Curated annotation (Swiss-Prot):
Deletion phenotype: Unlike E.coli, triple recB-recC-recD deletion is no more sensitive to DNA damaging agents (UV light sensitivity, mitomycin C, methyl methanesulphonate or ionizing radiation) than wild-type; has reduced resistance to H(2)O(2) which is exacerbated by further adnA-adnB deletion. Triple mutants have no effect on homologous recombination or on NHEJ of blunt-end, 5'- or 3'-overhang DSBs or on incompatible 3'-chromosomal overhangs. However the triple mutant disrupts all single-strand annealing repair of DSB.
PANTHER family: RECBCD ENZYME SUBUNIT RECB, UVRD / RECB / PCRA DNA HELICASE FAMILY MEMBER
Subunit composition and interactions: Heterotrimer of RecB, RecC and RecD. All subunits contribute to DNA-binding. Interacts with RecA.
Renumbered residue ranges of the record's region Nuclease activity, interacts with RecD and RecA: 765-1083
InterPro entries: DNA_helicase_UvrD-like_C (IPR014017), DNA_helicase_UvrD/REP (IPR000212), P-loop_NTPase (IPR027417), PDDEXK-like_dom_sf (IPR011604), PDDEXK_AddAB-type (IPR038726), RecB (IPR004586), Restrct_endonuc-II-like (IPR011335), UvrD-like_ATP-bd (IPR014016)
Role, per record: A helicase/nuclease that prepares dsDNA breaks (DSB) for recombinational DNA repair. Binds to DSBs and unwinds DNA via a highly rapid and processive ATP-dependent bidirectional helicase activity. Holoenzyme degrades any linearized DNA that is unable to undergo homologous recombination. In the holoenzyme this subunit contributes DNA-dependent ATPase activity, exonuclease activity and 3'-5' helicase activity. Unlike the case in E.coli, suppresses RecA-dependent homologous recombination, is instead required for single-strand annealing pathway repair of DSB.
Active-site residues annotated for this sequence: 975 (for nuclease activity)
Molecular function as annotated in GO: 3'-5' DNA helicase activity; ATP binding; ATP hydrolysis activity; DNA binding; exodeoxyribonuclease V activity; magnesium ion binding
Reactions this protein catalyses: Exonucleolytic cleavage (in the presence of ATP) in either 5'- to 3'- or 3'- to 5'-direction to yield 5'-phosphooligonucleotides; Couples ATP hydrolysis with the unwinding of duplex DNA by translocating in the 3'-5' direction; ATP + H2O = ADP + phosphate + H(+)
One GO term (biological process): double-strand break repair via homologous recombination
The name this protein goes by in its record: RecBCD enzyme subunit RecB
Domain UvrD-like helicase C-terminal intervals: 349-607
Coiled coil: none
Amino acid sequence: MKVFDLLGPLPAPNTTTVLEASAGTGKTFALAGLVTRFVAEGVATLDQMLLITFGRAASQELRERVRAQIVAALVALDDPSRACNDLEEYLVKTDQQARRRRLRDALAGFDAATIATTHQFCQIVLKSLGVAGDSDAGVTLVESLDDLVSEIVDDLYLAHFGGQKDDPELSYPEALKLARVVVGNPATQLRPRDPDPDSPAAVRLKFARDVLAELEIRKRRRGVLGYDDLLTRLADALEPEDSPARVRMQQRWPIVMVDEFQDTDPVQWQVIERAFSGRSTLVLIGDPKQAIYAFRGGDIATYLRAAATAGDKQTLGTNWRSDRALVDRLQAVLRGAQLGGPDIVVHDVQARHQGHRLVGAPRNDPFRLRVVSRKPGNTRVIPIDQLRRHIGRDLAADISALLNSGATWCDQPVQAKDIAVITETHKDARACHAALLAAGIPAVYTGDSDVFTSEAAEDWLYLLEAFDQPHRPGLVRAAAATMFFGETAESLAAGGDALTDRVADTLREWAGHARERGVAAIFEAAQLAGMGKRVLSWQGGERLMTDLAHMTQLLQDTAHREGFGLAALRDWLRTQRSERGGESERNRRLDSDAAAVQIMTVWVSKGLQFPVVYLPFAFNRYVPEPDLVLFHDDGQRCLHVGGADPAVARAGRAEAAGDDSRLTYVALTRAQSQVVAWWAPSYDEPNGGLSRLMRGRAPGEAIVPDKCSPPKISDEDALERLRAWEAAGGPVIEESVIGAVSPVPPEPAPEDLAARKFFRAIDMAWKRTSYSGLLRAAETAGVGVSSEPEVTERDDEFDDIPVVAPAEGADVPSPMAHLPTGAAFGSLVHAVLETADPFAEDLTAELATHIDAHSQHWPVEVETAELAAALVPMHDTPLGPLAPGLTLRQIGLRDRLCELDFEFPMAGGDLRGGRFARLSDVGELLREYLPADDPLAVYAERLSTGILGVQPLRGYLSGSVDAVLRVGEKFVIVDYKTNWLGTGDGTLTAADYGRRRMVEAMLHSDYPLQALLYAVVLHRYLGWRLSGYDPATHLGGVLYLFVRGMCGAGTPVVDGHPAGVFSWEPPADLVVALSKLLDAEAP
């Protein structure tokens, strides 16, 4: 195969070029170099190039590398003496001025470059296609469909097997696993094709197909898409030869480069081939020897098929990562090896680094193989648990010796962070982690651990359960034993009821913090109480604190996104702990950024490099007998779901063995200077990747067997085979004898660092608040704890307001007299009134539809039909003097603005210093502007005195106005209220909502303050949006609609005021003055 020359001729227009890389050969550098050349030489501008890779981190790295290469080229063009590599020296030879101009233009417009993951690229294209693609702009892209799949399995399992008396052919856990695997492998044929109709295979196949069909229906119905749907939809849009999508994509991107192409899948290649093959310059860069993501959909057969049809195929021939001595040793073992087939072969590469950069190590051979021996003549295998203990201790001793030896790498002392331990399984990784920590060697490992299964998640659950019922001693003691409090069984017993009561009081206090400032405030309070210092003093404390902080963030984000209170968060956390999801945020985070040995799986290590790499268990691989088998049939990716089938099992094992051979290649090639591996006679040693490479084949043989033969072998015979590789230039064979372990001295702390001291005074007057927040801040009552709703309920209504004013008008029964009270009911009514169309031909049906939709968030024990019927009369109730002759039914959506969300600064918002007002100043404005006979004039006294009056108006005010109605040229504010104003046990009637009684309710609930703030919001909004705005002309006052008193056209009217409709028109000058006051201007 021809070796690729970055300085050679650029790929010809409208051709496909495959660049086959090897580990460490700099494919990202080659790709960035090609981009720089295309731009510098005027072949294309940066926005005419599409760069695709297969992961977010990879796409970000690629973007940074491309930009850095363009910057470096510009530096060289400005000063040729600063050219740092062959590419830059090539670019400065000719046409410097034009090349400089082109690269500067590219840098200036770099944000226009399309450097994206496959899914991001599909999203961009589908959005731009409009009707040319099967894409709805209103759909939501979700990271995981696991919850939806679980829901479908629940329903279909009941439908398929619920009526059976005998045990079903498919258990529920099997059904759930089957569904998730099938959904996770799109563009895969399900097998067997035609099973016997009554066979178990037919049952499983039908269930799988039904899941896929139902998933499509529910995704459409709910307006959601998974990432794989993006690919499928784009592939469908590109299928016709004359597809407008093809034309647009070819015109936009005449040059396309795909990185990590070995990880492609059939649909991804279908998209790329249909859009660009033969029409754009297509460069595919990948290394089939590193195709290790079959379990994520990566399909090596697709890569090989694409590579076979490419017009030009070249290889990257220089290893920029590893020392020559290591490259030579690895090539002695890997040269010519077929890693899954004759088209996936290890080719020789040349090493860029000719020397050996690791100096002074106790054992400085670049490739070492440590062999665990048995007694002479013994062929019995060693149990893997015993090997994990032995190899873990041997690993720790070897690393300890290296770190204490004074060895250097690139003239710098070897540190723990220069060492990686790479395994295939998390169980092996955990064993290594424990062994290193036991030996006093700093090590970090994140693993596949789900943070929801961690001790931190469990402690958060105990805490949330105690928040809900702080009066139950058992729950309080369980919370006390968590990391948040740190109590033990002994301390709880000794502290007795007094300690339990103190913890309960703290729980109530923390619950108050959560309500005011979110869940993160609980974590902060616990930190201030000493949790961090206590937990970090424990062994593994960094891991625990990292998980606690991670869980806090997830809970905070969920509470903010979903509107959950503490009780809803408790239920959500229980669900998350019982179901494993696919979201990346579930993965535990690195617990320390200190210099430490990095322990990781092979998949995580891909793309990384380390001076020294340890492979303690590459010799061993457990091969399960899966009931769901991925395999290829004549190049077609298939998933066998029909149960046991010997032929399919053999095909699956063969492909799995090829994957494992490639895993071993990836692991071996992470090292820059030294690889240390082990071999031991375990039960699963015949399946191990390293064993099959070295025991399963002799030097010079290409085929790597799927399993070593014979499966059991004596130490003498094993050593004979392994030493043949040593003689051929491979690893140095060492006996695995555990040496002494010396503690690794900690890294010296920098002497020129000191904790910064905080001297500034915190402005306690600044806050982000709301009308309700201003009232809560003035409350002196202690914080109580109760079960909270799943979504934040309205907190500006009172279930039962004590009123003493006599009822007025006729006793027309309230349509809502027998409906529930409470915040959830009020929130449901508000949500329905915000979204229902009053112009609907059948208003009752319209209301019922919206009641059903909103009841998912606001579950209330009320029949839909009953509530819908009760809400119709309010739409026919006269709205009084502010909207003369009108009802809500007569004001359509074009003349109403629902849910006017707002947030505006008070006293300059974030500006430091300066004057600011208090609520008592608002009271003075009311005295100045409200006439004495105004029904709410007495509210000035309430604002001017007491704790409420001293509340500062500084920071940001946020909230939402229920609705604004356009009535002629005026704009009227509307706020819906579901308050119960009845007295005694009598039937609720319109008379309970006369004007005098509503005035009482307004004053009792501080609604005048809410009305004034909303008036300022409307004043500012109209000043921004309405041309020729005049407050006196356009401000139309405030309507507080007490919906329980609105009884329809027959609603009693007293002195021009209908029952249930409170009208108030504060003077426009008052609103303008208040707006200025909130800005800290002189009114």
